[in-house]
Amino acid sequence: MTASLHIILDTDPGIDDAAAIAAALFAPQLDLQLITTVAGNVSVEKTTRNALQLLHFWNSDIPLAQGAATPLLRPLRDAAYVHGESGMEGYDFVDHQRQPLAKPAFIAIRDVLMNAPEPMTLVAIGPLTNIALLLMHYPECACNIRRLVLMGGSAGRGNFTPNAEFNIAVDPEAAALVFRSGLEIVMCGLDVTNQAMLSPDFLNKLPALNRTGKMLHSLFNHYRSGSMRTGVRMHDLCAIAWLVRPELFTLQSCFVAVETQGEYTAGTTVVDIEGRLGQPANAQVALALDVDGFRQWVAEVFAYAP
């Protein structure tokens, strides 16, 4: 199968990010052109190190650029309590000498977009700081973005505060800017990612699959978004799954606003499912997932990896 969709992946690895990066690299329908890192699950120095370790593990020459170390206006609040202090606890990666590109992520994204023969798809599975910086500094790049597919937000409950999902809550100002940008947005939030569970039976089969399966199994043993006994949630993998198997998702066009001011509600995505606010839709919001189909696709894409 010929790769047909050229993508840029913005990420904050992160254990479920590792699974998403594997899918982005090895799904035959995708052509990953650039990886950029952002502070989120852990510091940007750690997310960059983790992404470089993964690229070395897979012997991949995909370029990588380090991005924002802090949110636009706030101090970083990370998720080391979910992913471990390093962000990818549980596997001993081999030492390497790889380095990121000598330019920040938003400039690297700009360069790839402006040199592409046709608009590209951005995939953001961490806080939206780098995407906001791109749009702030180079608004002309929007014409070269086919769409933005993101993991973030929720039409209901949060996982970082009672109402806010982690990626949006870390940098709500960046998210608000992105949702106001006019980009075509597909939002894969907690409404679907909480359904994206890999079962214990699935997890137990990973080590026999290949080197990647062994590595991911080791990481999942240290992942605190679920457990090996009850299953683990693959939040970030949903964004990649939508690119390849959009029929697995039920989407609805909605107006989405990001709250930036509330003492208890900052980072909340206000998803106007019923159109009560009278605002035009600015996102396609995923509200349901074919879980069995998702698991089947994950098994297929992991099998493509070495």
Swiss-Prot record:
It comes from the Bacteria. GO terms for molecular function: purine nucleosidase activity. The active site is at residue 235. The keyword Metal-binding does not apply. GO terms for cellular component: cytosol. CDD domains: nuc_hydro_IU_UC_XIUA (cd02651). GO terms for biological process: purine nucleobase metabolic process; purine nucleoside catabolic process; pyrimidine nucleobase metabolic process. Keywords: Glycosidase, Hydrolase. Pfam families: IU_nuc_hydro (PF01156). Gene3D superfamilies: Ribonucleoside hydrolase-like (3.90.245.10). InterPro entries: Inosine/uridine_hydrolase_dom, IUNH, Nucleosid_hydro_RihC_nonspecif, Ribo_hydro-like. Its EC number is 3.2.-.-. The keyword Chloroplast does not apply. Hydrolyzes both purine and pyrimidine ribonucleosides with a broad-substrate specificity. Belongs to the IUNH family. RihC subfamily. PANTHER family: INOSINE-URIDINE PREFERRING NUCLEOSIDE HYDROLASE (PTHR12304), NON-SPECIFIC RIBONUCLEOSIDE HYDROLASE RIHC (PTHR12304:SF15). This is Non-specific ribonucleoside hydrolase RihC.
